[in-house]
């Protein structure tokens, strides 16, 4: 992606300063929770903590502060800065990334973090070959020159490579894990419920169904955390979370429904963090394997004109979202701010259907209960499209079955949600539109256009950001005109917490993850 180029201020960091706000009522700090402890209420327990095996942000809230990475996201910004590495160089052919490690970093058992630990981490990740390994498909091998110098050799140009290292799966693992292997599992059973990193915290206790407890890593070389302990408490009932937050029995509540947050923000001593995220809700429109009518651009455009975007946002997100303008959300570079945006226009939708020679269209809408707002969203879309003369049959199924159907293309329409794994527009443009990535690989509308393939593939294989942006903008104009998806809305990140919690920084690439090492209580 980028070598140590001059830092750029991302659009999102500006938005976070300008658009974010706290809905709050100030009050003296409640002393119920110890000043040196932080208690976070979660709705459900976690299941698996190995950074080489989990792709779930819910697990990352534990693992991210317990590990360090070669590079880290820069506060609220989506650019990266040195982490365990003090610097790095990229070869002229963009295939070799060589990192120089800082000295003094140690794992939670006192072992020094060196180049061999870095190599062990990525060799292990690739051998385990689970979800996180997919982000390193371009990685050929890792070599060690000396204890503080490590090189990553790529198979091909990968402009996003540097950013993948800042993700949870880039956490450097203590090689002692090798001694914890059971039946050749490379320590997976051990790291499922332990941590082995050099981050500010270490997991010390996990009582299933009750809580997880982190304590300060005594060997952490960075800024010493304010909190001596952090407790992630399982509180399944939303009303209980709300009551405990109001009483000061917890510091942060993750499970309060969106439609309650406006009133929660008026509670004495409580604030609600509200900042733009990079998570989007969109509608898969099966271009090639669904109802034959959906292969016609005019029909897909009609669906896009029939969606009541404001109604969807108001009902499902209590107004805490913004209509998308094309596939790339605000805050991600490479976005075309002037690309066409569909508006609700039932007359236009009917006209497009007529011009396509389509009448009495009946299509299925697939969804699961994975997201609590999808049931109401499905009903709204059914009602919206009915106003344009399209009958929508709702098909509710379990999440696993829905994923299988989506992967096979056995649907007409389906609800979807997406957030990027790394800060690069390829996470949207190449995943969503490349005809070589049908199904769960990313292209869930089974969209195919050779012109778009050419643009996005070229963009994904060069490092010049200006040129990449030009290519992605050209592709955006096509996929919006062809209504490859229903581009619905970009969600806000909302988090209720006690007003005496200080220093929380939201990074859109680290949603549900806390910067525990720099947070405190006032």
Model-predicted regions and their roles:
Residues 207, 306-334, 369, 373-382, ...:
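Detector for C-terminal structural segments
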Residues 74-75, 167-225, 229, 346-347, ...:
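Gly/Pro-rich hinge or "lid" segments in bacterial periplasmic/extracellular proteins
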Residues 41-92, 123, 196-198:
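N-terminal lobe/hinge region of extracytoplasmic solute-binding protein
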Residues 201, 322-355, 372-373:
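Structural transition elements
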Residues 39, 114-121, 147-153, 199-200, ...:
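Alpha-helical secondary-structure segments
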Residues 86-131, 145, 151-153, 244, ...:
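Aromatic- and charge-enriched surface segment that lines or borders ligand/interaction sites
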Residues 217-263, 391:
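Ligand-site clamp/hinge motif
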Residues 100, 134-180:
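Surface-exposed binding/hinge segments that line
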